[in-house]
Amino acid sequence: MQESKKPGRVSIPLSAVRRWNGGVLTSNGYVLDERRLGELVAVPEEERGDRAQLRARLQRDGYLFLAGLLDPAVVLAFREYYFGLTGPVADRASYRKVLFEEIVPGAEYAAFCAQPALKGWFEWFLGGEPFLHRRKIIRQTAPGENGIGTATQAHYDLVYLRGGSDHVLSAWIPLGDCPVSRGGLTYLEGSHHRVLEEEAAGRLKRPAASITADLPALATQYDANWLVTDYAAGDVVVHTAHTVHAALDNVSTELRLSTDIRYQRADDAIDNRWQNHWHDQDGL
């Protein structure tokens, strides 16, 4: 099978693209151009214990895909806890009450996000006391949900965190297996370099909003690939505040559940707006 190519990039083979939903990947209903797809690459095992190499990789790529960082049993236990509370609810209002009054501020969620395998990794990687922002987000996407605003649109996190350090790191954690068809996160290759340059030059002081829902057009604008992969329970992706990312549509038959949280050094500037529990009406 011949590979699809684009100048200066190496795309994944068409055979690999086609195993993901028959080669048709969408986000908010927009069909991604298979010529502008790449594979999100996990950090090799031999580099996992080398902090200098990891920092260099993060600076180069804008993300660290840490396959199997967490114990899958711990991840699946939290997933079971979540659906144990939300499963019985019959309407949207009841679901939101359970989510924002029980799960988000609950001890179980706090413990999951600060588990030793996660907090300890950030302490080691950051080289200092880690600080976990209280505003931690859980996202659920049902099969077949599509259209503008359903999947997370393309954005970079700094626009929501300008009140603190731009060295804050995000951790995206699939709460259960999340193959491409289930709507996992996708990263725009090398986008952080352009964002950093334009932010530094004062040309990109974007408001706290997404860039666009049109991922194909953004890939063309940046001359970059959208990076995708199949995630498994236990995987974590750490990315910088300047890395453009989005979510794919869930075209599977299962609910997609994930959480995204932020860690940084405790001695760096902290955005105080993120020190309350997340709510979808909190204005951030």
Describe the predicted segments one by one.
Residues Q53-W124, P143-N146, A151, Y187, ...:
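Non-heme Fe(II)/2-oxoglutarate
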Residues Y95-G106, L118-L188, H192-H193:
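Conserved double-stranded beta-helix
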Residues A151-V159, T243-L248, I261, R265:
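Histidine-centered catalytic micro-motifs
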Residues A171-I173, E189, T253-D268:
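A short hydrophobic beta-strand segment most commonly corresponding to one strand
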Residues C178-V244, D268, H279:
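Double-stranded beta-helix
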Residues L185, L248-R256, D271-Q275:
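Short conserved catalytic/interaction loops centered on acidic-Pro-aromatic/His motifs
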